[in-house]
């Protein structure tokens, strides 16, 4: 499944894409894949929206985190160490930009100005924390001076100042002719013009020199203005302090810094909209806990983690946000842990399949390979892969392993899937044999799956013992019956499964669902004994 078989390497990466319509056995198959990965010493992180992995997570004594209003999933994606800042800040910054724009813009793409400003605030925010600003260097002041002068020449402020100075000079000259009281306002060069002892040639030369020096004097005076402006910018930067890293402190920093940038760069940015939209996640807001609480550090040591976020899947703001910060947790885990890592995103991936997220998804997929990690996306709707360019460009194109379950429901529309996944005619022929061959005799119940690794694709049967079936099941009554056994036995999940399966077989009941219904009806653990 990972693209390798012994020493044979079929793929360039282990990222995978799974397509299986409802009823095709997708959940059972994915549980089987996760079991195999875990038993091969892989750290597993799953984002789910339907309790499909609750049983196997309990079996492996993993961590099952289910979102609720009483116990929401909360993290602090803004918190990083100095080492992370020095070594991986570029990647972290891109993630935080995606996060901020997910909050601010939703599915809308940010403008160039918005991207530039948010990028600058994030950069300066971390500089203020790790390397607090004191003053501009001589080189920085010189560059700022040139930039600000050029900016004012571009926007007409310099021309306006120059015109005002020239008008002021002309006004003084006119007043000189009509009133001797203004003679004191004229500079040394103008005094030459007033000197009755001066010859006409000297007066003419003085007037010519005055006219020649005026632009230089104007620019020199204007540069003094710019120096004062830089002094103010320096004071503003120095006053921007960050004491701790969190969304709260970033929000405060951004709301102080962005208005300064708007004035300095003469740009437009919807600062009031920005402040209002992000405010619910700030201190005292309805969602203040989401981005300001430190993540339980023990999660980085857990080998099997399931985030169950079904309760928030209909929230257009929280759903993509939570998926995004879980992906960031995996990214951190990916760097910290040395062994193989796997992130599986079930239907929740649709929350982030937006233009704003496209670059981050591509980055995650490409980075996974460098850190012995893989990302898998699981879906059941054909439209999910045929109607979204984000899926094709960011997910499919960066996945070398495709897994398709029974596609008979999609037979009339399969040409679109074939084109999107670049399947061959031979692949398609194999796919439409899934669960259709006469190969069931002498085997326990199973379903089939087509797995393509690189250019090589084949159909495989998914056969598991009844103990695994009970760990994987998503049938509500079977899950409830198993939980009942666990409570009554006071045992761990494995013992409960072993006892349940033993009783099921010894009961003579063929189907696990029928036995589960019997357990729930009679409310007891049967403890059947094997007859000698």
Label the predicted regions:
Residues 3-36, 41-53, 61-72, 310-430, ...:
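Conserved P-loop NTPase motor cores
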């Amino acid at each position: 499944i990972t693209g390798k078989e012994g020493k044979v390497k079929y793929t360039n990466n282990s990222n995978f894409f799974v397509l299986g319509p409802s009823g095709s056995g997708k959940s059972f198959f994915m549980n089987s894949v996760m079991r195999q990965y875990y038993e091969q010493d892989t750290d597993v992180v799953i984002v789910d929206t339907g309790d499909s992995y609750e049983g196997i997570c309990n079996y492996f004594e993993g961590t099952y985190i289910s979102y609720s209003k009483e116990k929401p999933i909360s993290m602090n994606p803004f918190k990083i160490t100095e080492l992370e800042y020095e070594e991986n800040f570029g990647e972290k910054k891109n993630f935080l930009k995606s996060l901020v724009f997910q909050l601010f813009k939703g599915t809308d793409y940010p403008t160039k100005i918005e991207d530039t400003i948010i990028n600058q605030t994030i950069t300066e925010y971390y500089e203020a924390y790790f390397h607090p600003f004191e003053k501009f260097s001589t080189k920085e002041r010189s560059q700022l001076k040139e930039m600000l002068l050029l900016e004012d020449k571009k926007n007409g402020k310099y021309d306006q100042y120059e015109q005002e100075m020239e008008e002021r000079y002309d006004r003084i000259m006119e007043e000189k002719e009509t009133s001797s009281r203004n003679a004191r306002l004229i500079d040394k060069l103008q005094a030459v013009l007033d000197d009755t002892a001066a010859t006409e040639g000297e007066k003419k030369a003085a007037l010519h020199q005055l006219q020649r020096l005026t632009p230089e004097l104007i620019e020199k005076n204007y540069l003094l203005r710019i120096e004062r402006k830089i002094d103010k910018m320096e004071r503003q930067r120095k006053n921007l302090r960050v004491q701790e890293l969190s969304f709260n402190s970033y929000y405060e920093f951004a709301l102080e810094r962005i208005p300064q940038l708007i004035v300095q760069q003469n740009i437009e940015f919807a600062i009031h909209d920005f402040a209002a939209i992000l405010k619910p996640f700030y201190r005292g807001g309805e969602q203040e806990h989401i981005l300001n609480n430190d993540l339980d550090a023990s999660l980085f040591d857990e080998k099997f983690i399931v985030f169950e976020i079904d309760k928030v899947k209909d929230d257009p703001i929280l759903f993509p946000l939570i998926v995004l910060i879980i992906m960031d947790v995996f990214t951190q885990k990916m760097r910290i842990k040395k062994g193989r890592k796997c992130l599986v995103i079930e239907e929740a991936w649709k929350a982030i399949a937006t233009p704003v997220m496209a670059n981050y998804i591509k980055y995650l997929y490409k980075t996974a390979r460098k850190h012995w990690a893989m990302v898998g996306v699981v879906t059941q709707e054909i439209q999910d892969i045929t109607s979204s360019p984000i899926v094709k460009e960011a997910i499919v194109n960066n996945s070398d392993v495709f897994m398709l379950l029974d596609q008979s429901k999609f037979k009339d529309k399969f040409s679109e899937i074939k084109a999107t996944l670049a399947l061959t005619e031979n692949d398609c022929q194999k796919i439409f044999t899934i669960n259709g061959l006469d190969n069931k005799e002498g085997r326990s119940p199973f379903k089939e799956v087509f797995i393509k690794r690189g250019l090589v694709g084949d159909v495989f049967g998914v056969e598991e013992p009844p103990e695994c079936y009970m760990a994987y099941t998503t049938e509500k009554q079977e899950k409830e019956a198993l939980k009942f056994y666990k409570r009554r036995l006071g045992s761990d999940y494995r013992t409960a499964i072993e006892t349940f399966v033993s009783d099921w077989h010894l009961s003579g009941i063929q189907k696990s669902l029928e036995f589960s219904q019997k357990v729930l009806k009679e409310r007891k653990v049967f403890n059947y004994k094997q007859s000698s």
